[in-house]
Amino acid sequence: MGNFVCIEISGDQMLDRIIRCLCGKGYIRNLEKNLRALQREMEDLRATQHEVQNKVAREESRHQQRLEAVQVWLDRVNSIDIECKDLLSVSPVELQKLCLCGLCSKYVCSSYKYGKRVFLLLEEVTKLKSEGNFDEVSQPPPRSEVEERPTQPTIGQEEMLKKAWNRLMEDGVGIMGLHGMGGVGKTTLFKKIHNKFAETGGTFDIVIWIVVSQGAKLSKLQEDIAEKLHLCDDLWKNKNESDKATDIHRVLKGKRFVLMLDDIWEKVDLEAIGIPYPSEVNKCKVAFTTRDQKVCGQMGDHKPMQVKCLEPEDAWELFKNKVGDNTLRSDPVIVGLAREVAQKCRGLPLALSCIGETMASKTMVQEWEHAIDVLTRSAAEFSDMQNKILPILKYSYDSLEDEHIKSCFLYCALFPEDDKIDTKTLINKWICEGFIGEDQVIKRARNKGYEMLGTLIRANLLTNDRGFVKWHVVMHDVVREMALWIASDFGKQKENYVVRARVGLHEIPKVKDWGAVRRMSLMMNEIEEITCESKCSELTTLFLQSNQLKNLSGEFIRYMQKLVVLDLSHNPDFNELPEQISGLVSLQYLDLSWTRIEQLPVGLKELKKLIFLNLCFTERLCSISGISRLLSLRWLSLRESNVHGDASVLKELQQLENLQDLRITESAELISLDQRLAKLISVLRIEGFLQKPFDLSFLASMENLYGLLVENSYFSEINIKCRESETESSYLHINPKIPCFTNLTGLIIMKCHSMKDLTWILFAPNLVNLDIRDSREVGEIINKEKAINLTSIITPFQKLERLFLYGLPKLESIYWSPLPFPLLSNIVVKYCPKLRKLPLNATSVPLVEEFEIRMDPPEQENELEWEDEDTKNRFLPSIKPLVRRLKIHYSGMGFLNVKNQNPRFFFYCFIYLLVVHLDCIIDLHSDTSGMCCVVHLDYVFHFPFVFPKTFCILFRLHFYTIKSLCV
């Protein structure tokens, strides 16, 4: 039989429990009423929750931080809401259990428990609703904890730090890039910016510092950022990149953050990482450093800031700090030597620091002299150069994607230290060396060359001076040493590149193995003769320009069958090529400009591959007989030579079927007789034309013309006629949508004394440089009456970068009203006493900080009339001195060594202007040695337009001029 359990309960207890169940809190009796109340109160609570959430969102958009009590309340509401939905979802079933008009239940215990839950939840909802009336829902965020990054004291970066910080803090700037060459101090400056966030307090919620470096992967960047955000646990690491990006975005989207990316080499995809894009709404910031300016544009910063090398005095201060006072004071001679060593670093902080630390303990004068010798002769051999400096710079070289671009970069090391390299000449040589490809069209190849040049500039491997971008580039001396180090196979094959440019050589250097030499540069020395025999069977490039060469031995070039580029220019006493020139069967580039060559050798016709031949300024060359045999010739310059466009020249040139670019002087006959050749002319000088009126219509057919000089021509009016629908019309009525001179970028008008205006230049819409000088009747540049029908269609000077006005005594107006000058960087006005107003208003020039006005005499500045006060305030600071003081040392060899008192001054001139301006001499005396005379003169700050030639080191002057100076 089964077991029985007996529980004894008194009747009074049972009755008491039943009464409490039915009558106490009324969990069963009031269930239906409580459910209705709960539903109503919950709706009110949700409305209150929505209001609080809206308040919080508004405050957080202002970068306020929600109160912790508010967040707790919102969390409780969310929890209660879920519980309420659960209870209400089963309410129909629970109500069916009631009986006796809701006073009792068929399932008393079950209904009692449910009713109790409803009652308690109703109390909680009512309480939460009353607590939701917050006076404040947010507070200012606490000061962000930015851990300062260790950094050494800096010298010379204070101004750059201020500019970079101010720009980053601008409301409209969300992304800012700093670019500059390796070792220039970008990371140091970046650390200073980072540490300023620690000083300024809680403007931002979080500042994230990430070192990217070359080859960094997306996953690595996400992991580094996640660590800063405390996301990087084991679970997070196992997520894919997309989910990681979602997590990063979720954390950062509610924060005002700063992301600092140091040393990026390519575009960083912020979206793929999960970084909310900075905007004026979220006020977040992304800053980065890079060596490549191209990356700045890819990242969205189209006005990046360049970190440049230190100015000389700042560089000296940094170097002194590294060397130490004890060493500098150990011998009075050492200070001067130390300055020389510091100058070798050219303001590069990396080199200044490393070399300064190396020299810190060296107290013997001989040690410093040895350092100067090594840094001058072969800096790569200097202690620590190959370990601490060159490898860091080499990263920029390694990042170049194209092997041809790398070759172009190494090629620039053939030029002297701190040399201003002419870009046109450089690119022409690149074309012949095969760096630019196989394109047979010179214009396309040249454009490709400029693209490659731009790549090197953006990579900060080359630099350019503001205002001279199109003409010259510079390779930093330490970067040049890196290039030579690479070219010599990191010092293992030093005779690959024999570069002894501008080092004072009087004869060619001794080479152990001529057969190993690939490229040789002996330019800018004092070599007079090369008579030795050399078996340079592998030589492809030979630079001998700017020497005092008189004789080039045929034996020296006999074995140079692979020679591609030969530059003999600027040897004023060189008058004859050896017949062995015919053996240079691979030669593609030959430059004989500025020599005294009298005739072309018979053997020249054997140079079947010759593409470029430069014979400009060969004043003794009377004939180009035989040049027609150079069937591959594509580029020929006869400018300022003694060869003119007569019938014999025309016959020779007509047979050059591949010729694409011709530069010649006084060739009206050539232009009229052969339209094909006329179309090839790119630079033209016209002198002594006496037509009245002067008809420029024949120039309209010269599709390739970009440089024009009109000199000593007497005419009062210029006519331009174009054919349109078989009808000739004057230049005032031709279709301005089809300008006559679409390619003309440089124009010089000189000594045209009957010319009154230059209104015709309206039909040269791409004019970049305009130079008008010594024309006494010019009263206005654009005549309003002549141009009135055109100015509604044509806006003049939209491509103009430089305007030079000199010796125009009647000039009163450039243009009658203010004009926009989107590209103008320089206006030079000298001896134009009646010019009182420039065509400028406050909005004419977009970048006034890069704009200069130079006037002489200086008092004319005070007589200028301005459009309004805003215009005056904007441009008055742009007015700079015009006259520069030069010191010239004459060595008696037909050259003048020019030393500018301002080392940053970049001096240009035309050879035929030198004598004109020597009336500016203010002092003349012999130097202390008695070996040369010293000339002080004031020279106009001048820009090269159509016929630019750099005379940074040497000026060639006629001997009779020098003799007259020495009297």
From Swiss-Prot:
LRR repeats (start-end): 516-537, 538-559, 562-585, 586-608, 609-631
Region (Disordered): 132-153
InterPro entries, per database record: Apaf_helical, LRR_dom_sf, LRR_R13L4/SHOC2-like, NB-ARC, P-loop_NTPase, Plant_NBS-LRR, WH-like_DNA-bd_sf
MF term (GO), any: ADP binding
GO biological process, one term: defense response
Entry keyword annotation includes rRNA processing: no
Gene3D superfamilies for this protein: Helical domain of apoptotic protease-activating factors, P-loop containing nucleotide triphosphate hydrolases, Ribonuclease Inhibitor, Winged helix-like DNA-binding domain superfamily/Winged helix DNA-binding domain
UniProt protein name: Probable disease resistance protein At1g61190
Record: residues binding ATP: G180, M181, G182, G183, V184, G185, K186, T187
Pfam families in the record: LRR_14, NB-ARC, WH_DRP
Keyword annotations of the record: ATP-binding, Coiled coil, Leucine-rich repeat, Nucleotide-binding, Plant defense, Repeat
Domain notes: The LRR repeats probably act as specificity determinant of pathogen recognition.
Family classification: Belongs to the disease resistance NB-LRR family.
Keyword Nucleotide-binding assigned: yes
Domain spans labelled NB-ARC: 138-441
Organism name: Arabidopsis thaliana
Top-level division of the source organism's lineage: Eukaryota
Residue ranges of the TM segments: none
Function recorded in the entry: Probable disease resistance protein.
Coiled coil (UniProt feature): 20-68
